[in-house]
């Protein structure tokens, strides 16, 4: 069954436009509350948010909606998405709710949910909520209305959790870091985590005003961090996005490391301490070089659909621990139940401290394959899936590339486009192959 409101990561949109309006969000919370009460007499829900100005309005709407259904609410204030996931589990709450649109600009916002175990909820739960939304609200009587309170030390509790994921016998003393929180949810906690572990920390992107989240800073705008790291002669820069569930890392030379490289480094660190993973989950976009390197270590790479939700589903299905995306969503399920930019950064820095090597030295054996992406606009009614010329050219190119590259052709989920991606060890070959494939999709002239 198709979901009406939920996307791949909760419900998201422009504030003031359906569905991100206060009246809908109140109805949403009421519907969620009714779903929760089918299995629990008096549920408790935690609500956290990022730093968007609309968070105040949506937080109030959620609180009212839950209370009207007889659900108690605990307000966490500004806190990273993975912090809400952790506290939901630690506080034995029924559900965690995050008000955030992640890496989007401030006019957007969204609502996403975590289970009592701190994991993202499945399609069946979302469909149950959407079904409840179609029903008339049933307000509980006054004696059974929910209550709300604030957990004032939520940031401190999450800081301690993050520190607990770093090896007890190691510190970050002697390391100089620049932390960029994208003027987002981690603006308080991220600098403190690294400082309390011994690092010398300077901060950028840590002065939110409600309107500047992700604006020119953070994981999706790393140029500011590169400039700060090189200017301050820091060892590393750590860039998070607005809700701090993704990571980009910069070294002293200004080199930017993406999620694929950092995932491999986390795997290599486990191997070095005798804890070799059975397998790793990436996505359709994970660079071929990572697959080749992992195979050389006797480790299987399985590709999930793009989206950290699908990486997590594949990890849980196989009972594996490590996975991630090139965008910097990294999962280490023996450390946390969801992607966490701060925890991921600590795993990378732990590998450096334990080995005495830099990130660049630890990744010296990895050279990412050049990747060429061409978007081909489709004409109305064009059937690209049954294009014999495309199928034939794809077979020829895959034979040419062998294990030294790959082809990925997929439709855009939002536009009438086909995305043609080719990876090869040689950039010119990748470009040539991508152009050959794209040409088969061009309309006849």
UniProtKB/Swiss-Prot annotation:
Cofactor entry: Mg(2+)
Positions of transmembrane segments: none
Listed Gene3D superfamilies: Alpha-D-Glucose-1,6-Bisphosphate, subunit A, domain 3 (3.40.120.10), Alpha-D-phosphohexomutase, C-terminal domain (3.30.310.50)
PTMs per UniProt: Activated by phosphorylation.
Phosphoserine modified-residue sites: 102
Entry keyword annotation includes Flavoprotein: no
Record-level Gene Ontology MF annotations: magnesium ion binding; phosphoglucosamine mutase activity; phosphomannomutase activity
Active site: residue positions: 102
InterPro entries in alphabetical order: A-D-PHexomutase_a/b/a-I (IPR005844), A-D-PHexomutase_a/b/a-I/II/III (IPR016055), A-D-PHexomutase_a/b/a-II (IPR005845), A-D-PHexomutase_a/b/a-III (IPR005846), A-D-PHexomutase_C (IPR005843), A-D-PHexomutase_C_sf (IPR036900), Alpha-D-phosphohexomutase_SF (IPR005841), GlmM_bact (IPR006352)
Keywords from the UniProt entry: Isomerase, Magnesium, Metal-binding, Phosphoprotein
Enzyme nomenclature, EC number: 5.4.2.10
One GO biological process term: peptidoglycan biosynthetic process
Catalytic reaction annotation: alpha-D-glucosamine 1-phosphate = D-glucosamine 6-phosphate
Recorded family membership: Belongs to the phosphohexose mutase family.
NCBIfam families (alphabetical): glmM, PRK10887.1
Function comment: Catalyzes the conversion of glucosamine-6-phosphate to glucosamine-1-phosphate.
Protein's name according to its UniProt entry: Phosphoglucosamine mutase
Species of the source: Variovorax paradoxus (strain S110)
Gene: glmM
């Amino acid at each position: 069954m198709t979901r009406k409101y939920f996307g791949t990561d909760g419900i998201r949109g422009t504030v003031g436009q359906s569905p991100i309006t206060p009246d809908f969000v109140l109805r949403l919370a009421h519907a969620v509350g009714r779903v929760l009460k089918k299995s629990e007499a008096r549920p408790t829900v935690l609500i956290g948010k990022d730093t968007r100005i609309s968070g105040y309005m949506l937080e109030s709407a959620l609180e009212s909606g839950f209370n009207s259904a007889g659900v108690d609410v605990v307000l966490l204030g500004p806190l990273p998405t993975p912090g809400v996931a952790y506290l939901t589990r630690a506080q034995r709450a029924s559900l965690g709710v995050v008000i955030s649109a992640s890496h989007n600009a401030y006019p957007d916002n969204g609502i996403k949910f975590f289970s009592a175990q701190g994991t993202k909820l499945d399609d069946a739960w979302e469909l149950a909520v959407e079904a409840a939304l179609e029903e008339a609200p049933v307000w509980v009587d006054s004696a059974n209305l929910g209550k709300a309170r604030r957990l004032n030390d939520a940031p401190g509790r999450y800081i301690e959790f993050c520190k607990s994921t770093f090896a007890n016998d190691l510190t970050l003393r002697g390391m100089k870091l620049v932390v960029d929180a994208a003027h987002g949810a981690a603006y308080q906690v991220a600098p403190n985590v690294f400082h309390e572990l011994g690092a010398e920390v300077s901060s950028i992107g840590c002065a939110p005003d409600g309107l500047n989240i992700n604006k020119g800073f953070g994981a999706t705008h790393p140029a500011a961090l590169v400039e700060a790291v090189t200017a301050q002669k820091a060892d590393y820069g750590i860039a998070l996005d607005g809700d701090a569930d993704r990571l980009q890392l910069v070294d002293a030379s200004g080199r930017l490391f993406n999620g694929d490289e950092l995932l491999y480094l986390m795997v290599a660190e486990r191997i070095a301490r005798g804890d070799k993973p059975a397998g790793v989950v990436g996505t359709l976009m994970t660079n071929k070089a990572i697959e080749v390197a992992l195979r050389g270590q006797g480790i299987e790479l399985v590709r999930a659909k793009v989206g950290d939700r699908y990486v997590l589903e594949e990890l849980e299905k196989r009972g594996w621990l490590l996975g991630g995306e090139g965008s910097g969503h990294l999962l280490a399920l023996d450390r946390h139940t969801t992607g966490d930019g701060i925890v991921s950064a600590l795993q990378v820095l732990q590998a450096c401290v334990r080995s005495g090597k830099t990130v660049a030295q630890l990744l010296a054996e990895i050279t990412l394959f050049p990747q060429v992406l061409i978007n081909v606009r489709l004409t109305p009614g064009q059937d690209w899936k049954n294009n014999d010329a495309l199928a034939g050219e794809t077979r020829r190119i895959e034979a040419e590339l062998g294990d030294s590259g790959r082809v990925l052709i997929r439709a855009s989920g939002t536009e009438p486009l086909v995305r043609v991606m080719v990876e090869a060890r040689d950039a010119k070959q990748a470009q040539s192959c991508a152009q050959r494939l794209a040409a088969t999709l061009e309309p006849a002239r």
